[in-house]
Amino acid sequence: MLKDLFQSALTMGKILLKSKINLPSYTAPEKSVVVIANGPSARSFIDKCTSVGIENLKKQGLAFFAVNKFSCQPEFFSLKPKYYLMLDLYFFEFSKAVFENPGLHPIAQYKPDFEKTQRMINETWQALQKVDWPMIFFVPQLYRNCYIVNYLNNPNIQFVTYNYTVIGGTAGFRNRMYQWRLGSPQCENVVNSCIFNAMLSGFEEVYITGVDHDFHINIMVDTDNTIIRTESHFYADENKKHPLLKQEADGTTGKIRLHELFHSLVKVHTGYDETSRYAKHIHKKVINLTEGGYVDAFDRMSLGDFFGQFSQKN
């Protein structure tokens, strides 16, 4: 109890330093939304949407919520998701010079393969500039006035700013801070932020798909103790292997240690558990449509049962 009270006081300090009060809220007109993560299992969901009829699903009140680099994929322009969210600082913290030349990013100096990552980030923003349908874009208030957000001057995109200040303390305190939009649960993964913001936006049912989260079985440690992670996404034919590196305090290149990696994964799933708790508190449904996967915080539903709720296209 004393620990929770201390965390409540500590969180108040964080809120005063990092959060903005009275951010404009957004209320979604739809009842149900599907958050489409980038895991391989999302392919089955997207293909089924195409066969049932994307516009048919939308007419029946279903909305789509995309994340991160989804706009780089052809499916983006067929699904035309109404909602989009980014959270990771790498999507926001770069200059005009880096946008024009990805190789100039400071991280690329110690992680040469980051140039490819930055190039894809740039392509993500360029694709968003081509959006010709109404879109609600959720952006952390910390980055609302950064270069790249200001660059995105597409009149079809409405920005909704949210506070990403991790809330700790007693359950009652956390609930009140969430209600007042002063912070959120730990969102080590962008999907958790989507779920949370969707609930705050009034959605009654939040479905998630493509949340494979099999990071822990896709790593190996090579002969010099470098962790190699294999990444797989629904839009890639080949899995990508890359070393997990970091920049040390002295500017040199270091290796991410195994305990650091698993500590991050613990935060991912702890965050999901907290979001699940809050969803129950405010009587919202969060349902996992991912076939397989390693997220155990939410109830599950098969794709067959999910699509069975909707009438088929004529």
Each model region followed by its residue ranges:
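Metal-ion/cofactor- or nucleotide/acyl-coenzyme-handling active-site neighborhoods
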Residues: 1-314
